[in-house]
Amino acid sequence: MKFFTLGGKQFWEDVFYYQKWRIQRHYRTKKYRLLDKWDICRATGSFEECRQAFVQMVEVFEIPRQTGSLVILLHGLGQNKSIFRPLWRALENEGYQVAAINYPSTRKSMKAHVDQLDFFLTHVEDIDEVSFITYKTGCLLLRHLLNTSYQWTTKFNIGKIININPTNTGSDFCNIASNFGLFRFIFGPMLKECTPFKAKRIPKLPTGIPFGIVFCETLKDRILKPIIKRYEGIKIPGDLTEEDFSLNYTHLKNKHLNVFDNPKLQEKCIQFLKQGKF
């Protein structure tokens, strides 16, 4: 069985990754499929059947063994892994192994996404260190993940963490949109979980991990800013700001529709992964 796919988007979740090959699970039917690095489906069935099919493909395609560290990219609500394409290419050009993870952010709760990532990390092979780069609300998902005890935490070290345009204090857009049924239908249960009220309840990232933040405003951010400003709640003196979550942060100018097309942002991410500082 071979057919081209679009890589999952909002209906398939990544549960296994090895040298750009991935096993995905459909969020509703729970069926699995094996995709090669060109997003061509090579097998379907249970996870074990897809895993066994991959083992056979290792010999057929002479897939090399992966070693060392892996950089995992986590997108935000309503997005998919494709948004990271310019960044993951830049990272690969620097020799990094990169896994941009698809998760159906508009279909399931944050707890369900954390369970998916737990399954994914449990099945990571031949890696001794994992670093994370998150975008927008992906930072909240990572905080949930790293503050829960899992078996995979003894398999490898957590290297470095980069938040890009994070919503660690919660999203004012999600707060406004959650009041409207249409937006709740479009964005799903995670919409309410990304509001400032809910974000405050999520523990911060564990200490001791090099953690940096990149602020790089997008065109959409500039368009939405006056609208959000008009309807946002009252800011209480002493409330945390995004800068309060890390002493290591940087602000970048941006003229690109996709923030990851910004060469300066790519440079800063590579710099932090190498040095642990901007």
Describe the residue ranges of each PLM region.
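Short, aromatic- and cysteine-enriched interfacial helices/patches
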Residues: 3-6, 12, 182, 186, ...
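Flexible, membrane-associating and regulatory peripheral segments of lipid-active enzymes
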Residues: 1-73, 80-90, 94-99, 121-124
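C-terminal catalytic-base region of ester-bond hydrolases, centering on the histidine
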Residues: 206-278
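Serine-dependent carboxylesterase/thioesterase catalytic core
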Residues: 72-75, 92, 97-208
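Residues at alpha-helix caps and immediate loop-helix transition turns in enzyme cores, especially N-
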Residues: 83-84, 112-113, 265
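Short amphipathic alpha-helical segments
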Residues: 84-86, 144-146, 175-176, 225-227
